[in-house]
Structures are given as C-alpha cells and as structure tokens.
C-alpha cells in the first residue's frame, strides 16, 4: 500500500482551513480531567466566534465538577475528510447576561429542553483558546493557528 498523497498546506491559509473544518465538523469532542483520569465526550456548541467556542451544559453532568476543579480543556474537531482542529484553552462560566440572552434566543433546542434562561441547571461555558492547531488528513503534522 502506498503512502497517501497530502497536498502541501500554505501557512497563510491555515486559519481559514481551520475555521472551515470547525464549520464542517460541527460536533467536537471535549476533553476534561476527572482527577488523574481524562474524560472525553461529544458536545454541541451553541455559539462559535472564530476559535472561541460556547458550550451549553447541565449542572448535574460530570463535566461540571471536572471543569470546576480544572478548567483546562481541549476541543477536537474532525471533519468527514479527517482534517482536525484542536483548540486548547480554558473553560469559563459565561455570566454576560446580554450574550446569554442572545445565545438563548438563537437556540430553540435550549428553549425546548430548559424552558427558561434562568433555569438553574443551565451553564454556558466559553472556551477561550490559548492554542489552536490544524492538521490536514494524513499529513501527520499540526500547523499552529495564529491567535
């Protein structure tokens, strides 16, 4: 079996390629730490602003305690072509009421399940990136995305 051909990546195109991968993949995997045990689960972002990702959560979910104990997280997007974007950052609880209202208004699923923005079960995390990396399928190397 021959090695797959991977077209070269122009470093100037890396930010756009990474954003396109995020848009195509839609549902990233979120990694957290549960003590010394990594935990990974799919999440459904409720808002994306460049490489800052907003994720809804319920207080009773395991990731609530994990993020409270260690807010360092990583999101991994992988699209149908196996291009990857890894966003390493810090998850913070969103408290900006106008932004919460905007997210609430634009997400019918949140409204259907939770009934009210003031539902005490609802938490929205803003994942602020400190590193973003992109890899084209089979390239086996990551490109740093400038922040």
What kind of region is each of these model predictions?
Residues 1-10, 84-147:
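Charged, gly/pro-rich active-site loop segments
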Residues 27-55:
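N-terminal leader/targeting helix
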Residues 20-34, 73-77:
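A short, Trp-centered hydrophobic/proline-enriched beta-strand micro-motif
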Residues 1-28:
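Extreme N-terminal tail/first-helix region
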Residues 25, 70, 107:
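Acidic-histidine catalytic/liganding microenvironments
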Residues 46-82:
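A short mixed-secondary-structure module that forms the rim of ligand-binding clefts
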Residues 11-16, 57-60, 108-110:
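Charged, amphipathic alpha-helical segments
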